[in-house]
Structure formats: C-alpha cells, structure tokens
Amino acid sequence: MARKSLIQREKKRQKLEQKYYWIRQSLKKEISKVPSLREQWKIHGKLQSSPRNSAPIRLHRRCFLTGRPRANYRDFGLSGHILREMVHACLLPGATRSSW
C-alpha cells in the first residue's frame, strides 16, 4: 500500500492538470502559429509561468486498489500482482490464468 500522502499528491496533480489543460493547449497552438522567435519566447514564458504540476508529463499512473506506482496495466488500472491475484480468484471475466 502506498503512503497516503503520495496518493493525495497525485490527486492534486491530476486536478491541476485538468484545470490548466486548455490553457496549456492554447498556448502551445499559439507558439506554433507565431513566426517570430521573440513572440514564441514570450508565449513560452507564459507557458512556463503555469504551475509545474499542471504539466501532464508529471502525472504517474497508479494502481487504484493499492496505489502502487509501478507495473501497472492500463487496461485494468491494476498493478501486476493484484491483477494476478484477481485473475486467480476469477474476479476478472475473460482473463485467463497463467502459471509457469
């Protein structure tokens, strides 16, 4: 189980990313449309003035049951060992067990 503070930090980042998503997208479009380099720098400065945690690259995918940040499967939103336990318990329809 991940620490609660890390999970809350990740939720805070998700909220910031959603809040600034359209602002960042519009600034990026402006940068691509402006031909002069000085204007691009000014717009880039505006983009940099937004909070760091509003950038989508800073988001980290976590297991929604345990909060584990590694070995996550996008299709299920679960970490590897939780996914394996659920498949062995027949809780995921359509998934087959594998043992080696």
Curated annotation (Swiss-Prot):
GO terms, molecular function: rRNA binding; structural constituent of ribosome
Protein name: Small ribosomal subunit protein uS14c
Record PANTHER family: 30S RIBOSOMAL PROTEIN S14 (PTHR19836), SMALL RIBOSOMAL SUBUNIT PROTEIN US14M (PTHR19836:SF19)
A Gene Ontology biological process term: translation
Main location: plastid
Cellular-component GO terms for this entry: chloroplast; small ribosomal subunit
Assembly description: Part of the 30S ribosomal subunit.
Alphabetical keyword list: Chloroplast, Plastid, Ribonucleoprotein, Ribosomal protein, RNA-binding, rRNA-binding
Phylogenetic classification of the source organism: Eukaryota, Viridiplantae, Streptophyta, Embryophyta, Tracheophyta
Gene3D superfamilies: 1.10.287.1480
Reported function: Binds 16S rRNA, required for the assembly of 30S particles.
Database matches in InterPro entries: Ribosomal_uS14, Ribosomal_uS14_bac/plastid, Ribosomal_uS14_CS
Record NCBIfam families: PRK08881.1 (NF006477)
Family stated for the protein in its record: Belongs to the universal ribosomal protein uS14 family.
Subcellular location: Plastid, Chloroplast
